[in-house]
């Protein structure tokens, strides 16, 4: 059958294209003669054309990858003249021969497994006699029972011999290991040769170049390398010195030739240092310490200066009298009788220098009056009534009298009243006490009423003066009644009918004293508001008494009770002036 494309040049001269593969000229001429004698086989039109084409593409790809020449043209020429007999081996299928011979796949050799899977169908090649027409297939199929796709390797003359050599396949790892060992040995040889060259180069340098080289290495080498080199050098020098010392004396060692690793310009200096180290011992260190201690003893000893007294703290000590001797919160006149600073005259001198010495005089007088109360009168009264009710009644009477005495303590405790009380009872005071400012003794007993009014007056008027007196113990009933009724003194003051006490009964009598008003810190201390001294000390008193509640709060007086107390004091000063 004449088809287009078969008259083109041979397959070897053309590139591979996606078209039905051409066949060679000899095969094509053979097929033309065969087709002229016999017509196309039955069922040729129903044959699947793509099977042979796919096999050809796979074969060409495999040939290009392996770079092998699988075409045996010599055998093909011999087999063209001598056609194959019709009888083939049992492993070759019937349907393989006509289709492969027609499409130029006669040189393909296949085994029984592949031909049974693809080409044994009778529909693909129904014409059996055409199997004997292709002469080239016989030479490839003479290998009976061979299941390989390719022909035997011995039949390919152009195949390189190294392909068949598998002797070194399992020895590659050993060869690689031997190669690595040779390279390492060569590198080690090169390393030691480089070290020898480097040492020889160092020996040729002069001392100045040696110093330059050492400086460069110290500045550029890593720290760990320098430390390792230092330790090795120390151990080497120590070993060299010990070995030399055992063999010969030190003066002979200096005349020896320079050994390897020790620089000759510095050998003398090194030997001197080692000699000095040998001469050092424990006795030398002890003697040096003893000499240092003698030098220290000969030097003048340094004396620590004594701390200076704080003159600022001592200045104005009348405002800080509370810091010298602590004052209790209850302001009880009996607390400080066992104080260690009981008879110190220094406090008396400081009080005489104070601008408010008249307040101290009045307060101390009240303290002495409260301390010199006459307990026998209370005991007589208790023996007459034989009950504690009389003591309670006398305590209430004392509170009322004390409320009257707070108006003016000097008038309530004048000398006429004290002499009258002394003549009425006919008793003399067993103890005598000196006043701190006057230096005179006072005698005479006092009633419980006068004692309590002095105690209440003292608690209301004096806030910063320590108590320096002693007194006899009072009966327990009187003490209990005092504790239970001491807080009611101001209420009694408010209910008293004195013409001078309206809204300022809780204020001290000297609240409007001009001397105190000119000294705001002392005036605030009298009111027990000295904690606000820093807020109000810079204000003139005539301006201060005009302040209201809001102004005081702005100045820093945050407590409501303190503001109310200041406002009452301002009203008292305004009324008195």
UniProtKB/Swiss-Prot annotation:
Basic residues bias (residue ranges): 418-430
Ranges of Polar residues composition bias in the record: 26-38, 286-298, 340-355
Domain SAM: 515-576
Subcellular location per the Swiss-Prot or TrEMBL entry: Cytoplasm, Cytosol; Cytoplasm, P-body
Any one biological process term the GO annotation gives: nuclear-transcribed mRNA poly(A) tail shortening
Biased composition (Low complexity): 495-506
Subunit structure and binding partners: Monomer. Binds to RNA.
Name of the protein in question: RNA-binding protein VTS1
Molecular functions (GO terms): mRNA binding; nucleotide binding
Main function: RNA-binding protein involved in post-transcriptional regulation through transcript degradation.
Cited SMART domains: SAM
Gene3D superfamilies given in the database record: Transcription Factor, Ets-1
PANTHER family linked: PROTEIN SMAUG, STERILE ALPHA MOTIF DOMAIN CONTAINING PROTEIN 4-RELATED
Family the entry assigns: Belongs to the VTS1 family.
Residue segments, region Disordered: 1-41, 286-355, 415-510
Key words of the record: Cytoplasm, Nucleotide-binding, Protein transport, RNA-binding, Transport
GO CC field: cytosol; P-body
Signal peptide: none
Positions of transmembrane segments: none
CDD domains, per database record: SAM_VTS1_fungal (cd09556)
């Amino acid at each position: 059958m004449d088809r287009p494309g078969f008259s083109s040049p041979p397959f070897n001269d053309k590139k591979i294209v996606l078209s039905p593969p051409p066949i060679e000229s000899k095969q094509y001429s053979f097929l033309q003669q065969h087709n002229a004698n016999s017509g196309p086989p039955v069922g040729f039109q129903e044959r699947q054309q793509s099977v042979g084409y796919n096999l050809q593409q796979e074969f060409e790809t495999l040939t290009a990858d392996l770079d092998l020449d699988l075409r045996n043209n010599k055998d093909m020429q011999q087999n063209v003249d001598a056609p194959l007999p019709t009888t083939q081996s049992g492993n070759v299928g019937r349907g393989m021969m006509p289709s492969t011979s027609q499409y130029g796949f006669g040189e393909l050799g296949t085994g029984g497994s592949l031909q049974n899977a693809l080409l044994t169908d009778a529909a693909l090649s129904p014409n059996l006699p055409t199997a004997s027409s292709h002469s080239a297939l016989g030479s490839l199929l003479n290998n009976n029972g061979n299941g390989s796709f390719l022909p035997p390797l011995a039949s390919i003359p152009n195949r390189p011999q190294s392909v068949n050599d598998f002797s070194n396949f399992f020895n590659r790892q050993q060869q690689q290991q031997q190669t690595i060992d040779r390279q390492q040995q060569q590198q080690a040889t090169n390393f030691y040769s480089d070290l020898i060259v480097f040492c020889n180069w160092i020996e040729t340098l002069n001392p100045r170049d040696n110093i330059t080289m050492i400086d460069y290495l110290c500045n550029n080498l890593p720290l760990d390398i320098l430390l390792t080199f230092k330790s090795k050098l120390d151990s080497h020098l120590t070993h060299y010195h010990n070995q030399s010392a055992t063999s010969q004396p030190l003066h002979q060692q200096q005349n020896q030739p320079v050994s390897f690793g020790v620089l000759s310009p510095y050998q003398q200096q090194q030997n001197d240092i080692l000699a000095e180290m040998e001469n050092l011992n424990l006795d030398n260190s002890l003697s040096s310490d003893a000499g240092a201690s003698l030098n220290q003893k000969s030097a003048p000893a340094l004396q620590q200066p004594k701390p200076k007294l704080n003159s600022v703290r001592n200045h104005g000590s009348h405002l800080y009298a509370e810091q010298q001797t602590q004052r209790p919160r209850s302001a009880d006149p009996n607390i400080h009788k066992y104080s260690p600073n009981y008879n110190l005259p220094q406090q008396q001198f400081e009080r005489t220098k104070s601008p408010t010495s008249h307040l101290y005089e009045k307060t101390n007088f009240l303290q002495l009056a409260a301390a010199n109360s006459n307990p026998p009168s209370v005991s007589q009264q208790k023996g007459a009534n034989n009950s504690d009710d009389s003591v309670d009644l006398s305590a209430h009477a004392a509170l009322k009298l004390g409320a009257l005495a707070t108006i003016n303590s000097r008038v309530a405790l004048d000398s006429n009243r004290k002499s009258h009380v002394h003549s009425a009872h006919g008793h003399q005071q067993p103890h005598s006490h000196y006043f701190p400012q006057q230096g005179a003794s006072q005698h005479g007993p006092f009633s419980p009423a006068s004692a309590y009014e002095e105690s209440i007056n003292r608690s209301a008027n004096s806030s910063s003066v320590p108590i320096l007196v002693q007194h006899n113990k009072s009966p327990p009933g009187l003490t209990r009644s005092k504790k239970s009724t001491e807080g009611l003194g101001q209420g009694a003051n408010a209910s008293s009918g004195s013409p001078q006490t309206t809204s300022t009964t809780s204020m001290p009598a000297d609240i409007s004293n001009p001397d105190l008003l000119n000294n705001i810190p002392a005036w605030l201390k009298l009111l027990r508001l000295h904690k606000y001294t820093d807020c109000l000390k810079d204000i003139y008193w005539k301006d201060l008494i005009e302040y209201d509640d809001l102004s005081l709060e702005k100045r820093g007086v945050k407590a409501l009770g303190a503001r109310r107390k200041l406002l009452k004091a301002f009203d008292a000063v305004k009324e008195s002036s």
